[in-house]
């Protein structure tokens, strides 16, 4: 199929979907390309970002956790966005695209529930019906977000098949869309999946990095030495990285979930510890068995519990432009506690992975003068019960 935009990032990406979905993807690509050139669409999108979502978000300098080091650490505060995470940015763009295509329904998948909440709020705002697929395990561990979705009129459909987590919700959402694409838009929640989704999601998240660049230049008079973001599917990270990719003096660091430790096999780090395959409509690194079956990923954070990764991250990793590391559950939990105790900010467990790596960089070389920015992709309200149960089991509370 001929596409308007390049469907690949190097060897990664593509459109590996049933033939029945090709017209839907073609229509979506055409709508996106025309919308990007339409001043009216851009004005409407920017108005929603500013006056509904609350952009630009703050860039907060950490006051206390850098004590005793020469590190200056800033947090890009996507946790302050309406909806509680960066997810709100791109769903507003996709919901406007759905209206532009004449769709009346939204289909979405969600892991931590943040994309589900974002899809529900955008659908409510723009008068679209919304149904959300969510792994049954995630429905249990993210009950506050499930109720938020219900409050905003969305139907939440628990998925019991497979591992009953995000990968299974993705499969069910795609299955639904293949039978309903004439009236429904599939609002994919991350910068992964078949073309044109990785490109659409990046472009609807790139204001994170654009704002960060302007804010850090105003505050510090220079660009950061590195920007750091957690990577599940990779949308918050690609949103932060996009405007810095050509700034070769700025390090790009993506942080995958190390779970119980890479050596245990219980993690979600396919970029560094997976093999390239075809899954979820794209060619990308993924966690798979010797015979090519998709393995279950694991993370304390439901939003990072994904067995593959967006194709642009795979490309940035293969070219060496970005570095990808992993952080374990325990390290993320310590970073979560540190930010709460010393800065008065409760981060999402997803974002805590990125923060943990920044703290590691700072502590391993306290004498080094470095300017770091962590993308604090979401707030941790949804995670307080998970953290409470772990700390209680350890006898810490």
From Swiss-Prot:
Q: Which domain of life is it from?
A: Bacteria
User: Which pathway is this protein engaged in?
Assistant: Amino-acid biosynthesis; L-tryptophan biosynthesis; L-tryptophan from chorismate: step 5/5
Extract the Pfam families matched here. PALP
**Record's InterPro entries?**
Trp_synth_b_CS, Trp_synth_beta, Trp_synth_beta/beta-like, TrpB-like_PALP, TrpB-like_PALP_sf
Give the protein family.
Belongs to the TrpB family.
Share what the entry says about its subunit structure, partners included: Tetramer of two alpha and two beta chains.
The name under which this protein is listed is Tryptophan synthase beta chain
Q: Which organism is it from?
A: Escherichia coli O17:K52:H18 (strain UMN026 / ExPEC)
Gene name for this UniProt entry: trpB
